[in-house]
Amino acid sequence: MLAKRIIPCLDVDNGRVVKGVQFLDIRDAGDPVEVARRYNEQGADEITFLDITATHHGRDTTYRTVERMAETVFVPLTVGGGVRKVEDIRALLNAGADKVSINSAAVFNPEFVQEASQHFGAQCIVVAIDAKKTGDNKWEIFTHGGRKPTGIDAIEWAVKMADYGAGELLITSMDADGTKAGYDIALMRAINDRVTIPTIASGGVGNLQHLADGILQGGADAVLAASIFHFGQYTIPEAKQYLAEQGIEMRL
């Protein structure tokens, strides 16, 4: 059995972390490189960097930030946000990203995922799925940060993306996100019952048991969280220890 992974997530706008970070020993909590360095030292298995900068001009800042991060951090780095074409992926990989996350662009052009996977290999292509519950065991894909409904069934979409060459799925419940009430376990379970590629649970973590639930009940291969780590509520080692005590294989 492969060890499960803990992935802190940074939301970055114009080269600055936007969901506040409270580490006592960080000089500049707004600098994503400082924050990533801290998580690297704590033993994060991977780090995810979501660029929410809308502007074209902001992309250059992003590439520079990724370059600086890759020099500082020695765990796999996934970068997402605004990835629309093969050139974007190439630029991020060249800057030092290990994996690239594709979200809205996959919805508008599913063949892009096939093309990306063939070009660079499935191992570095993550498809991010933002899903909202619309009924009993039914979820719909939303784009534009969860604002735009697409009418696409999230479970069928996950299967399609796996078929199209995604190496991994990052599954965020728009309902759970920010609630601190735990992942949408039913959503994770429904997708994991249908796909064989690794999945990452995202959205809703408020405590360490939620991380365990994502793995033990949801079937996730990795668990992503932001605020519980950013605000110093828990450290990565505490989270790993807790999961290991639940019988989950971790890299301690």
From Swiss-Prot:
Protein name: Imidazole glycerol phosphate synthase subunit HisF
GO CC annotation terms, alphabetical: cytoplasm
Keywords: Amino-acid biosynthesis, Cytoplasm, Histidine biosynthesis, Lyase
GO BP terms in the entry: L-histidine biosynthetic process
Location of this chain's protein in the cell: Cytoplasm
Pfam families: His_biosynth (PF00977)
InterPro entries: Aldolase_TIM (IPR013785), His_biosynth (IPR006062), HisF (IPR004651), IGPS_HisA/HisF (IPR050064), RibuloseP-bd_barrel (IPR011060)
Subunit relationships: Heterodimer of HisH and HisF.
Documented EC number(s): 4.3.2.10
Organism field: Acinetobacter baumannii (strain ATCC 17978 / DSM 105126 / CIP 53.77 / LMG 1025 / NCDC KC755 / 5377)
HAMAP family referenced in this protein's UniProt entry, alphabetically: HisF
Pathway(s) this gene product operates in, as recorded in its UniProt entry: Amino-acid biosynthesis; L-histidine biosynthesis; L-histidine from 5-phospho-alpha-D-ribose 1-diphosphate: step 5/9
GO MF annotations in UniProt: imidazoleglycerol-phosphate synthase activity; lyase activity
CDD domains attached to this UniProt entry: HisF
Catalysis: reaction(s): 5-[(5-phospho-1-deoxy-D-ribulos-1-ylimino)methylamino]-1-(5-phospho-beta-D-ribosyl)imidazole-4-carboxamide + L-glutamine = D-erythro-1-(imidazol-4-yl)glycerol 3-phosphate + 5-amino-1-(5-phospho-beta-D-ribosyl)imidazole-4-carboxamide + L-glutamate + H(+)
Active site (catalytic residues): D11, D130
